[in-house]
């Protein structure tokens, strides 16, 4: 359960970073 949650958090983090880089 913890690994699945961590994977989701990492995935969301990468998506957010991608959006930020796209805006800059």
UniProtKB/Swiss-Prot annotation:
Signal peptide: none
Tissues in which the protein is found: Expressed by the venom gland.
GO biological process: defense response to bacterium; innate immune response
This protein's GO CC annotations: extracellular region
Localization in the cell: Secreted
Keyword terms, alphabetized: Amidation, Antibiotic, Antimicrobial, Secreted
Pfam families: Antimicrobial_9
Taxonomy, superkingdom: Eukaryota
Residues bearing the modification Leucine amide: 24
Family: Belongs to the ponericin-L family.
Function: Has a broad spectrum of activity against both Gram-positive and Gram-negative bacteria. Is inactive against yeast, erythrocytes, and insects.
Protein name: M-poneritoxin-Ng2b
Classification lineage: Eukaryota, Metazoa, Ecdysozoa, Arthropoda, Hexapoda
């Amino acid at each position: 359960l913890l690994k699945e949650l961590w994977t989701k958090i990492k995935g969301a983090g990468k998506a957010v970073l991608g959006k930020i880089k796209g805006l800059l």
